[in-house]
Amino acid sequence: MQRVSFEVKDTEAEKSSSEILSGSLPSTYRNPAMENVGNAVDDGSSVKNNPKLDMQKQNGLVKWFKKCLTMVSGESKAPRLDRSKSTAGQALKGLKIISKTDGNAAWTVVEKRYLKITANTDGLLLRSKFGECIGMNSKEFALELFDALARKSHLKGDVITETELKKFWEQINDKSFDSRLITFFDLMDKDSDGRLTEDEVREIIKLSSSANHLSCIQNKADEYAAMIMEELDPDHMGYIMMESLKKLLLQAETKSVSTDINSEERKELSDMLTESLKPTRDPNHLRRWYCQLRFFVLDSWQRVWVIALWLTIMAILFAYKYIQYKNRAVYEVLGPCVCLAKGAAETLKLNMALILLPVCRNTITWLRNKTRLGVFVPFDDNLNFHKVIAVGIAIGVAIHSVSHLACDFPLLIAATPAEYMPLGKFFGEEQPKRYLHFVKSTEGITGLVMVFLMVIAFTLAMPWFRRGKLEKKLPGPLKKLASFNAFWYTHHLFVIVYILLVLHGYYIYLNKEWYKKTTWMYLAVPVALYAYERLIRAFRSSIRTVKVLKMAAYPGKVLTLQMSKPTNFKYMSGQYMFVNCPAVSPFEWHPFSITSTPQDDYLSVHIKALGDWTEAIQGVFSEVSKPPPVGDMLNGANSPRFPKIMIDGPYGAPAQDYKKYEVVLLIGLGIGATPMISIIKDIINNTETKEQLSQMEKGSPQEQQGNKETFKTRRAYFYWVTKEQGTFDWFKNIMNEIAERDKSKVIELHNHCTSVYEEGDVRSALIRMLQSLNYAKNGLDIVAGTRVMSHFARPNWKNVYKQIAMDHPGANVGVFYCGAPVLTKELRQLALEFTHKTSTRFSFHKENF
């Protein structure tokens, strides 16, 4: 819908341009009446005081005055827009520009610009200066916006007053949905006929879906345009009225933002929660610090006592060795340096033993599943404790090395013969004269090599290297160091480190009796346990070579594998297993959440290409078989060349404890939805089993009681947040299955696509309307392609917690999050806040990848 513009050339005005610039009227308007008008204006009196001025001459004066303003501004004519551009496209782009304006920008700022710009135009703002006045960088859109606002206000001409400018400004900065929608249609309706053809509707759909990165809707623009025309043009007139489309959009948006609050009591509860959640600050510093400490201890008491015990044991060992060597003759020569070195060495022995325990996954899984130690021991923090111990080792190595290299050895070289004599039985009868004597000794070589290997392993274990964050910054040959592979292989250098540690401890200075060489005593049990676990993994993987039954390739570089399930492979939803593909690397094992349920007769994993190994395994599978259409499975029977896959597990994870809670909040970010998918399927299975048991007349009470104790979940909320529309294809069939089987409405599903502008934004209003129409007609969501309606933009997590707290007062809610660390802090903080300020207790569990 384009507006046809006619440009009428005013030759008289051109001829009299010099007269205009000189301040005199053109001859066309020179007559006695107009002379009087001119005098009146010069005198500052009102034009209305001249009774001889008729309406025709007044209009002529206005036209002449506008031309004067145009000439004064240095423009012979107003700039014209490129009408070849899409009207809907300009409108959508314009909404983006408007959204960037600061609604809180003081009107006084705009007013100052207005006064400055109109200083020479008698308080009238030119159309060409509108963008500059309101602070809009896009001059082209500023002109378009001016025209739209002028049409809406029934203003004609290219100038406005301050009052009209203020009215325009208020409409621009009204960010309500209704106002934005009105502005959108005002921008489109350039000829003010209020009509849209099917082609224009199709164009709007394509542009809106493109702006929201929804290729699925863009590809079906013809179908959706026909659906809108069928809805709004039942008489087949060939066009629809904008007002009708506007009402439909408003209706869809009203439904999307409506809430379930249907009673005054619930509204009052919501207000009370909002009031209680307002931040308060105690003026008493001591009381405030005490409250913060108390809340921290209550929320993290498991971590607190474990860390406190660890620090206490280290302090005792350090103090014991310090005092022991302070009372020996060597203290007279080496002083506190030897005490520091020996104290640090004792903590090193402890930590080198402890650091293996958190990665003994089979042992931890057994303790988690078979004992009640999980009540006191934070098994979920095993890797965090592993990292904390690593920091303790680094500190101990630094103190021990510096004390020996920078203090003890120089003091021994500088000691007098009399001072050295008592130490001869430990360092040799002949006093060393060179520093190299200590460096090239067995103790020195083993110690330095250990430090060197530890530095390599510790450095490449840092997140910047392990997650590949530095890959782009490193030069070509070093890029491979910033990868999970480099971390995995260099961590196996600790096999050498432990061998050297035993040798270093055996040839230790100042101790000759075997029973005083305690390094092997510290390491014996943890090393044996860890070695046993690695042997178990090797044995299990050799007999658990699974067959790939099906595979599927999905958008977003996700590979799904369905594998045969070994006979004795028993697991719980939320757990994970290690996967090895010899065709990629015979040594590398990578953990993946199990997306199938314990009741399924197969195992499934979803592998997203996030690193070198995951990209490699996708490449291997794509080479041996032609990639299937998106979401279609390839059967292993028809493709026997699938690569060999080995598995090891299952292993415990935080999400497996969901059955302990009556209410669970499951949050998956991107591929982090994988453990949650298994859980919600398991909830459906357990719910159906529970209903069947309750309906059975036979069966022992003990069996029913046992099922009640193992499965407590009565309500589940699942939030899946992803930025790509194609991601929903990963679990499309599962979502449809859950929506169909969940007869009791136990699970509340929420899919959020963050590429779409938030609900309430006009740029996504058309998508919301199409979503509502298509769901009502076909029962499918146009974004996800499932029976579950999708939401736009990121969830308001505070509102999510608030709604759950309102619906389940006094309940213990388990919050399980899997995804990138970006959300961890916010979700944990909200769990603490609502736990402290409401009757609902939220227990937060995370699983980052």
Swiss-Prot record:
Domain EF-hand: 176-211, 220-255
Ranges where the FAD-binding FR-type domain occurs: 541-657
A GO MF label: peroxidase activity
UniProt-annotated location(s): Membrane
GO CC annotations on file: cytosolic ribosome; membrane; plant-type vacuole
Region annotation EF-hand-like 1: where it falls in the sequence: 118-128
InterPro entries given in the database record: Cyt_b245_heavy_chain (IPR000778), EF-hand-dom_pair (IPR011992), EF_Hand_1_Ca_BS (IPR018247), EF_hand_dom (IPR002048), FAD-bd_8 (IPR013112), FAD-bd_FR_type (IPR017927), Fe3_Rdtase_TM_dom (IPR013130), Fe_red_NAD-bd_6 (IPR013121)
Keyword NADP belongs to the record: yes
Amino acid composition bias (Basic and acidic residues), ranges on this chain: 1-17
Membrane topology, from the record: Multi-pass membrane protein
Name of the protein described by the UniProt record: Putative respiratory burst oxidase homolog protein G
Annotated organism of origin: Arabidopsis thaliana
Lineage, broadest ranks: Eukaryota, Viridiplantae, Streptophyta, Embryophyta, Tracheophyta
